[in-house]
């Protein structure tokens, strides 16, 4: 099957390089576009008592995420069409990006690394209307 736009959902982890390499191996033969999406970390999850520093911490975490995506794209040896940093429910953002940017393949890794989440793995399915 020939894809035209591949969206890769990555986490800020070393495994994302392998995920992007797989996407590039699919995209390169057909010159498909490749875009990246990731979740921004929310500092409120880490410390609810440091309210005055939250905005600064949020900005630093966002910048680190941007830098990771830039470095990931540079090491891919393939042009990255767009990068998206989402917050909230990732599946909703993926669906919105797919609809708006005509994505026809989504590649995801495991964003949840706890033992319990691996043992009780589940998936959500959202369907986009056919074009």
UniProtKB/Swiss-Prot annotation:
Q: Which residues form a coiled coil?
A: none
What are the protein's UniProt keywords? Cytoplasm
SUPFAM superfamilies, per the entry: Adenine nucleotide alpha hydrolases-like (SSF52402)
Is-annotated flag, keyword Cytoplasm? yes
Tell where it localizes. Answer: Cytoplasm
Q: Which InterPro entries match?
A: Rossmann-like_a/b/a_fold, Universal_stress_UspA, UspA
Q: Which Gene3D superfamilies match?
A: HUPs (3.40.50.620)
Highest taxon, organism lineage = Bacteria
What are the GO cellular component annotations? cytoplasm
Q: Which Pfam family, any one of them, does this sequence belong to?
A: Usp
Read off the NCBIfam families from this record. PRK10116.1
Task: Name the family.
Answer: Belongs to the universal stress protein A family.
* Protein function: Required for resistance to DNA-damaging agents.
Q: What is this protein called?
A: Universal stress protein C
């Amino acid at each position: 099957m020939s894809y035209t736009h591949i969206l890769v959902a990555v986490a800020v982890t070393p495994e994302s390089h392998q995920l992007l390499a797989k996407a590039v191996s699919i995209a390169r033969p057909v010159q498909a576009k490749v875009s990246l999406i990731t979740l921004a970390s929310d500092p409120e999850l880490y410390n609810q008592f440091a309210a005055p520093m939250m905005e600064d911490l949020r900005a630093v975490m966002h910048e680190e995420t941007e830098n990771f995506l830039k470095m990931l794209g540079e090491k891919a040896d393939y042009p990255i069409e767009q990068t998206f940093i989402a917050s909230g429910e990732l599946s909703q953002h993926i669906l919105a990006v797919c609809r708006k940017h005509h994505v026809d393949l989504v590649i995801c890794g495991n964003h949840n690394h706890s033992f319990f989440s691996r043992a009780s793995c589940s998936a959500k399915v959202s369907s986009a209307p056919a074009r």
